[in-house]
Regions:
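Alpha-helical transmembrane segments and their helix-helix packing motifs
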Residues: 1-327, 346-359, 371, 376-386
Length: 386
């Protein structure tokens, strides 16, 4: 498999997972706002912190009311992580590798993108219906991917992107709950506190499974233990880490035991730390510090994966840069650019890879709409390392 193809598959699924999470976060928060007692703090700003976009939001919306938060998270073109932009970037990455993904996958992500971009009927719906339709569209894409894509490297890199994004968002929303939603001790244990813990479980899509597996009162320790350490819930951190380790082993092609490299060491050590600990130990040592350390490990895993599989082998270590950085070109992009230099432009180059942290201009509807849905040609790039 080409590095460029693996890169696109990875980011398609990260962005679809991110969009699905945002739609669920906003949908749950809107429902929770109706149940909050009069005069209570609105549950909106923590969503900005969970997505790591507080500085940008404060610049764009100094007042920070609920309508502005929803607009920023869902439709704002200036927010590179807004729901609409995530779907647009996922669709553009899918367009570039249409000869690799299945027709059903392309049709689903393309339909979802254009229903958001051009459908007046879509935005005329109540907000809850809009978010529910987007969430279901993302989940349908997961189902189509699992049902139609062969269990080769294409599927493994798709799953890898989804799992890393899922683990990251689970830790972020849990961290926000512990240290941002309830700054005053008098709120702990009250009605608002219980509502917030229920909303946290719903944000993670975990409310019913928590009720079935734990069969106990909703209290902070039990919720944290379920989201972090449960081995069978598909959105728990431990579950994601186990599948990440398995996926990396399959992708590496290592069949014989040997000295593990940096990527295998980090994935194994991270999984071990979260498999052989208890929630009491995590809380005693500082849950916030443990989550911070885990997020750092997840970022390091992403960087190592990008350096091994998404950067051409011919590059020297000094040439390595953060994956999909805005404005940068990979070896395959430069090769494609040279091949197409004599051709008249007809939209974005087929081998252009959308950045992981794109600028607002790169994500504008006009720029995304300019892309023609034609199958890209595979350029000759370095194969994945085995």
């Amino acid at each position: 498999m080409l590095s460029r193809v693996a890169d696109s598959l990875y980011w398609i699924n990260r962005y679809v997972e991110r969009a699905e999470n945002i739609s669920r976060f906003v949908e749950v928060s809107e429902a929770m706002a109706l149940d909050c007692p009069p005069g209570s703090a609105e549950p909106w700003l923590p969503l900005i912190d969970a997505n790591g976009e507080r500085e940008l939001f404060d610049q764009l919306y100094p007042t920070g009311n609920s309508e502005e938060v929803v607009r920023f998270l869902v439709r704002d073109e200036k927010n590179p992580s807004s729901l609409v932009n995530c779907i647009g970037v996922a669709r553009e990455n899918a367009r570039q590798i249409r000869d690799v993904i299945t027709t059903e996958m392309w049709e689903q992500i393309n339909d979802l993108h254009w229903s958001i971009q051009e459908g007046e009927r879509f935005w005329d719906q109540p907000p809850q219906e809009q978010l529910r339709e987007i969430r279901r569209g993302c989940q349908l894409f997961y189902g189509i991917t699992d049902a139609t894509l062969s269990r080769d490297h294409s599927w493994q890199f798709s799953r890898l992107g989804r799992l890393l994004e899922r683990a990251d968002k689970t830790t972020r929303i849990l961290d926000v709950k512990y240290f941002l939603l309830l700054p005053s001790p008098e709120d702990v244990g009250g009605v608002l506190d219980e509502l917030q813990w229920i909303s946290l479980l719903r944000c993670a899509g975990a409310y019913q499974m928590f009720r079935q597996s734990r069969q106990q009162m909703i209290e902070p320790k039990a919720v944290a233990s379920f989201l972090l350490l449960d081995p069978s819930f598909p959105r728990s951190v431990r579950y994601c880490l186990e599948r990440i380790k398995d996926t990396l082993r399959i992708v590496s092609g290592r069949s014989l035991p040997g000295a593990p490299d940096a990527l295998e060491c980090l994935s194994g050590l991270t999984l071990a730390r979260w498999s052989y600990t208890s929630i009491d130990e995590l809380i005693a040592d500082g849950l916030h510090e443990a989550i911070d350390s885990l997020q750092s490990d997840l970022n390091s895993l992403h960087n190592l994966i990008a350096q091994r599989y998404f950067v051409a082998a011919s590059l020297s270590p000094s040439d390595l840069s953060p994956p999909l950085a805005a404005g940068q070109m990979s070896a395959s992009q430069m090769s494609a650019s040279q091949q197409q230099a004599s051709q008249p432009p007809d939209g974005p180059a087929a081998d252009t890879i959308i950045p992981a942290n794109p600028t607002a201009a790169e994500l504008s509807p006009a720029n995304l709409a300019a892309a023609k849905p034609t199958t890209s040609k595979l350029t000759q790039t370095a194969s994945l390392h085995n």
